């Protein structure tokens, strides 16, 4: 019988986050919110005057301060809301501060076009003026985008097409969330099981192969029936991105998508080429999965099936805290001291309660502690989640300690690096101290699954996306037949001869929502590869690698992400980091195969 969740008031406060460093009370929050409108409205005084370095510097100081106030109000309300999403008061707080964010964005909208309308020689002089020295990197970045910024009238016209250009994404989400219906199926015992969009992956993780197979056929039958609509919506999304890229003087939609973080195309192409070089290792893993499952033919309804039974171990939260502390020991005493600080000062909301937001995240703002939301359940996965979120948290903490507010936030390109380094350090620490073959095999398989899902699978998606956009740019028809054929070819390449290429898998591209955020998925693969390279360096090289890594954690957004990673010792403009990561994958495969042999 499932455990009944307690109300938040029934839980021990020592396992709940302490938000009082942000605001002493909800009443203090209300007072601060009431004063915000005047702060936002004061920014309008700068409109039409951003023509010299002194005025621009004063504007940037003022807007940064207002931004800090809004961010602190938002973080408090958001976290209060997540404590119990049923709480009407917290819902109201969250909605009201959300509207202030919209108001602030509108109040600031004049600044960027006004600054960029200045002659280039004037802008160059302003960027190098001591009056804006604290914002030089931001202004240089703004200047970098000038060739792709249109006139005020053109920007207004392009903005008016915003809803039209986002329509394909809306069509996709409405189709997938509201219109797709799936036939109920029978499990291995003959019981009827409902299939939904949200339970499909859990069903595919079942140990009941009959259920997995039937759910697989039911699920993709609905996608097949709607595949022409999915293809039309995706083609529309690509055409919208291609049109905007052309309007903004970018050579391609990919160049536009990658320009924001100043990442060159060769990083993307290096990733695909290097993963392609290591595809034989993926084929080895497919053979290992087939062997461990003991099946004559491995189908795509077997790819999520558990290879090793769940560990029966349960961990107290206190044990989990110690496990994470041990795992990050290679990062030094000062890193561990911050972890202890997070534990002692109640940065973490540990246990589930009725109404609490599910999942986990790391949050907070420049003027608060970082905070972690967990729903700790005592599993090894829960321990890993604590390590993961602590990685984000200490990245945020060090960035905020070492950077001014305008440079404290790191980019999405590097966002998962620190969290994955911690996960890898945890699993390495567990493997180093585990002799039981069954437990070792469980841990090794978790490691392999992370590689498969985050490096190989996301790179396959990235290759699909690159080719789909290129087809539109070449003027080729992007219909269901073309997309299905492209996806099936890639799946065949990546999974190899030991995998049965089920007919339905050609429709899988249609269920990937990330494709409506162009050229985003590759960052999962580069981020994971970077984290593997860094964690390997930390464990093998020791202090020099740790020093570089901590400096990277302290950089926030003060440089472009590739430059930050180079500082840490990883150059994604070369194949080396992805090569190193996939060589690690091969060593884990060796270990898993040897461990399996001991059990047979």
Explain the meaning of each model-derived region.
Residues 1-310, 595-600:
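A well-structured
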Residues 313-315, 348-368:
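Catalytic zinc-binding patch centered on the HExxH motif and its immediate surroundings
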Residues 326-337, 360-363, 392, 396-404, ...:
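Conserved helix-loop functional segments at active or binding sites
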Residues 313-315, 365-387:
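Short pre-active-site segment immediately N-terminal to the catalytic Zn-binding motif
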Residues 9-11, 20, 24, 111, ...:
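C-terminal, non-catalytic "cap/extension" segments appended to globular domains
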Residues 292-330, 336, 370, 395, ...:
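Long, K/E/R/D-enriched contiguous segments that form extended
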Residues 249, 377-397, 419, 424, ...:
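Active-site recognition of the HExxH zinc-binding catalytic motif
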Residues 410-438, 447-449, 453, 527:
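Post-HExxH zinc-binding segment in Zn-dependent metallohydrolases
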